[in-house]
């Protein structure tokens, strides 16, 4: 598990056995072979270390390289966000992140504001829009962010990025049209599964059991009466 708080930035390089991340070890503290590590939000395993060069190699399957941005970014030798796995004694400053990318997004707009940046993104697969709502947690390229607003049922949304996050991650490298790795909040996935299981035991199929405010209130998941 991870928190979405980036600890180091490295430079990605392709390898015949996965990927190399160069220049990131200094910011990661102690690290050993077999450790889990998130690279641009993708959970990988450290397979080789190069202490002299300040880098490490991680195994990555063809599926991982093709279904995330890692394959194309390795070819471009792009900068990537790196975070070691969460210890039980660590502070949870971001939110719980599994490192299992749900899908890709496309950067629609990057707007500088007086004290922040507004980053607009759209899912490449619109079906993931159901997990997005205002104030929801979201991981973008391994960075824990909060949804500031959304439209089209969550298919497109925007994120407020503070200066510290902008300067200490790869966000400032992003351009309109870039693909980004996205992982939705684990809580949203678990809640959906629980509610759909409950609905199907009552005789409805998942497609017949929409998660509405009425349904949530009727089943004790929301306070107040939806009929008031």
Model-derived features with residue positions:
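Conserved loop->alpha-helix
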Residues: 1-228
């Amino acid at each position: 598990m991870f928190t979405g708080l980036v600890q180091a930035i490295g430079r990605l390089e392709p390898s015949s056995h996965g990927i190399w991340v160069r220049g990131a070890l200094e910011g990661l503290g102690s690290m050993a072979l077999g450790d889990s590590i998130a690279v641009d939000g993708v959970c990988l395993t450290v397979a080789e270390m190069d202490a002299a060069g300040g880098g490490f190699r991680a195994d990555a399957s063809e599926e991982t390289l093709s279904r995330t941005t890692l394959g194309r970014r390795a070819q471009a030798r792009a900068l990537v966000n790196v975070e070691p796995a969460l210890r039980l004694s660590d502070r949870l400053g971001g939110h719980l992140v599994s490192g299992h990318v749900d899908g890709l997004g496309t950067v629609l707009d990057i707007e500088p504001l007086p004290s922040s940046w507004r980053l607009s993104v759209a899912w490449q697969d619109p079906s993931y829009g159901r997990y997005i709502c205002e104030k929801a947690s979201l991981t973008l390229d391994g960075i824990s962010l909060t949804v500031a607003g959304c439209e089209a049922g969550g298919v497109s949304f925007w994120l407020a990025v503070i200066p510290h996050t902008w300067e200490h991650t790869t966000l400032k490298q992003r351009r309109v049209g870039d693909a980004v790795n996205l992982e939705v909040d684990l809580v949203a996935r678990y809640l959906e599964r629980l509610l759909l299981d409950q609905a199907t035991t009552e005789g409805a199929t998942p497609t017949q059991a929409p998660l509405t405010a009425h349904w949530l209130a009727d089943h004790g998941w929301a306070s107040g009466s939806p009929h008031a």
